[in-house]
Amino acid sequence: MANDHPPRPSRRGFLKAGSAAVAAGASLGATGVAQAALGKTPAHGADPQTAVEPFYGLHQGGIVTPQQSHTYVAALDLTTEKREDVIALLRVWTDAAARLTQGATAGPLPTGAAAKTALADTKIDTQVETKADAKANDTAYSPTNAKAAPDSGDVLGLGPCGLTITFGFGPGLFTKDGKDRYGLASRRPAALVDLPRFNGDQLIAEKTGGDLFIQACANDQQVAFHAVRQLARLAYGTAAMRWGQSGFLSGPRGQTPRNLMGFKDGTNNPSTAKPQLMNEFVWAGATADAPWMEGGTYTVVRRIRITLEHWDNTEVDFQEQVFGRHKYSGAPIGKKNEFDPVNLKEEDKDGNPVIPENSHVRLSNQASNNGAQILRRSYSYNDGTNFYIERWPPWRQETEYDAGLIFVAHQSDPRTGFIPINDKLAKFDMMNQFTTHVGSAVFAVPPGAKPGSYIGAGLFET
């Protein structure tokens, strides 16, 4: 891991490596930040800590963006009854996210001798707080305390780290307890269906659902968490945290990451470099019921605990039969290279399928699912240990790892993507004896925002 994820630079070292994004974000006014966030193409730096991703655009970032090394995903429940409060929150979130992705603070920093002294180590320029900024701080940036800091300050000097922030809307934004909510029930996309209960699900309410979704991805764990932390604070009084989860990648950058089971995860993804595939499988079109979703996507998040203790005591040959791939190369069984095509018709000398009938690769393959594909952008998680009773032999009852996969999948329609694919996996996949789905959510992720507008404007204003 040390070679895969370079150590973060010191605050002074970051300045030498290129602190322009942070300095610009802190010293420019709102217009300057918006212009920086509008970058036509990602400004990938040689150092992952200085990489900058644009915020504004046709699509939201964090979907087809090259995967960063860390994530923090969260869902919030709306507590307000007023439609205008939701719009106000989305405006504030959009402005803050545009700043954060450029390496700036969530709100304009205060000025004065004390502030300058505190920032001396980071060499971040302070923005001159105008009357308009002060009013914004009093209303938007400090919803519960007008004197609260506009930013927690825990990532000052760390750089943008390729941060992307993605927002989504859960079914609860449209209806609650069967009743219209905020006048949006008629605008709920047909594709935003409630996920069915799948075989083997052991969902925990506190890790399931949510009205609003935030996904922050960055090349630094603290930067990803910091982004969600600021946005959650800005939501005080309008929305409350329902669940949150951090995650990480394993593997060299630019290569398919490995999950905690030691296998490469995402090899058969549709290529994000091919627009025709993204338009077919990932980006939503302008349907009659939800024209505002054109250019957006539908995101499924599943928290999947893996019984690592059980898995670690199985033979590699068996593990490869479970996956349908060779563990170390990532190649399909019987092949040599990771990206060799999967041949589901190939048989051994005895007439048995080379790739087992109930292997993960066969059951999830496009050829086994009427041509359906989803874009997986998953992360591993490790939350320490807990006491568990295993649901498969040997049915151990002991303290085990609370670790596994934050499964994240984007698609143009869950009804033809995740739902039928996972229904088959939940019934027949050999991997089920090592995994348990304990969290689940689905969100409509609207298209990107334009400068001066906000995420989801098409839903509320057209």
Pin down the residues of each PLM region:
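N-terminal secretory signal peptides
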Residues: 1-9
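Long, histidine/aromatic-enriched segments associated with O2/redox biology
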Residues: 13-33, 38-462
